[in-house]
Amino acid sequence: MLFVMLLAISAPIAQTGKPWLEWTMKETTKILNDSAWGQTQLETKQADAGPAAITNTGSSRTMVPRDASKDSPGAITSYIKYYIRLLSAKPVRQAVVRKLILDSPDISAQRKEELKSFAEATTSDFIVVAVVAEAKDRSMAGEALQAFKTATLESLKHSTYLERRDGKRLLLADFKAPVADGLGAKFVFPRTLNNQPFLEPGGGQLRFYCVLSKSIRLEARYRISDMMYDGRLEY
């Protein structure tokens, strides 16, 4: 049995109280996977539990897959996580670079400066949603990999969009399949609608939705009021 659960966002950490180059790995990971700009969608496979099976819900801390060797009815036997991030948001790019620096402390000064430029750039033309998949087993990983590999702008443009509270949508403008940069698949949207910024500070939410394949649907919701970062609405 497959079910999809969007993991709840806990309190945002728009400000950590220190420069991004001093973030810990824990702070960096939270920005990427559980923040106003990064969410985690978990899809699990359960041992056959029959028609009376119950879909579980919980937070990222409570939804820990059980031992795959114990395939009693309802036991989670496999899972895949989709990390859905607003890559055009500065805190996400800063977290990506900070994680790389923490993982590679011997990185050259020149490379570090190049990465800092990427992290601190201001995005004005596009909204970019990056999706990274992480699977427990090869079967689920293979299905996701194939879906990303074969997807095209043409196959996605009618079923992939960003939506705000009033129902207005931005349609997909470009799609880049995953490459060796570690950032995942990239879904590119225009930043304006009718020559006006798509989002303004305030309430409401931004919803990302994508039918990647017949069996894979991606969805994430971002609370606009939590997206303020260093005095700017970052998305």
Q: Where in this protein do the model-derived segments appear?
A:
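Bacterial N-terminal signal peptides
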Residues: M1-S10
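PEST-like low-complexity, intrinsically disordered acidic/proline/serine-rich tracts
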Residues: I13-Y235
